[in-house]
Amino acid sequence: MGPFHVESPERVLVLNRMLEEEAAGEFLPVEPRPATEAEIAWIHERGYIDFLKATAGRTSVFLDGDTSTGPRTYETALLAAGGFLNALDAILDGRVRNAIALVRPPGHHAEASQAMGFCFFNNVAIGAEYLVRRRGLRRVLIVDWDLHHGNGTQHAFYSRRDVLYFSTHQVPLYPGTGATRETGDGPGKGYNLNVPLTAGKGDEDLLYVFRKILSPVAAQFKPEFILVSAGFDIGRGDPLGGMLVDREGFGLLTDSLLAIARLSCPGRVALVLEGGYDLPTLKNGVREVLARLGREDPGPLPDPAVSAVTARELEPCFRTFRDSWEL
C-alpha cells in the first residue's frame, strides 16, 4: 500500500523517529531477517506464496478491495515475519527479556491462501508455529487486542490445543468473524476464545476482560510463551474504530500480560504490530507499551470497574467459556 493508504510506511517511520528522539539507548534493537519460504509455508499455501512472490517489482497488484501490493511488498512481508522470529529467538536465547516487533505489513487477517485487510503473511501465526516446530514449545498463547478480529490467526489454529487464541474486537466490524460461539473444533474445542465488544469500550472495560477472563484461562492453560497481536486501532480517535483506549490503557493491558507471563513463562512476552492508523495515538500507545516492558516490577494492577452495558455483553462469553475453563 502507498503513502495515501491508512496502512502506509509512515506508521513505522513515526515509530522509528520516536525511538530515536525519545528512547535512544533504552532498548536493544533486534535486526530483522527475511523469513524463509519454508517458514512461511507452515501457515500459507505454496501457490499463494508463489503468487505473492510474482508481484515483486510490479507497480501494483490488487488482491482485494483494500489490499494491494507494491514493488517490494513480498520482500517487506518476509522481513516482517522474519523480524518477529528473530525477536522470539532473542527472548528464548536470553538476550532480551521481552520484545515488540514494530513491523509492517500487519498479518492477523492473512489466510492460508488469501491476503486480506492489509495483511499478506500472518506474522503472529508464523511466530507461534516457529515456537512449536523449531523451539519445541508445547503451549503458546496468542492474545489479539486489535480492533478487528484476527480471522487468519483463528483459522490457522482452530483445531489445535497447543496454541490458544484469545481475541477482543469491536463488532459489528470487518471481517465479520469472531463470534463467541466460535470456540474451536475437534481437539481445539475451547482453545479459541472470542470476546466481541461494541464500540465505546475503554481502558477499564478491556482491563476487566483481561483480569476476569484471560488471566484465569491463562493460569489453567499455563502458556510457555505469550504472543500479542498488538493493534493500536482500539485507541481513542483511530479513524477505523470506535474504541476509547487511552495511553494508560495500553500500559495496563501490557502490565496484565506481563503478570500472566511471570506466573507461567518467566516473562516471555513478544508483541507484533497489527493495526493503528492515527499516528499520534499509535506513537503514544507504543511508547507506553515500551515503558511497561522496560519495568522490572510493574506493581499491582488496579481492580477495574465495569459498566452494566459491558457486563451484559460479557455474559455470553462467561457462559460459553465455562464449558472449557473455570471462570
Give the positions of each predicted feature.
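A general "terminal functional-core" signal
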Residues: 4, 51-327
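Low-complexity, intrinsically disordered regions enriched in charged/polar residues
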Residues: 9, 34, 42, 46, ...
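Short glycine-centered helix-capping/turn motifs at secondary-structure transition points
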Residues: 19-25, 47, 94, 135
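N-terminal low-complexity, Ser/Thr- and acidic-residue-enriched intrinsically disordered segments
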Residues: 1-42
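Charged, often glycine-rich, active-site loop that binds/positions anionic groups
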Residues: 33-57
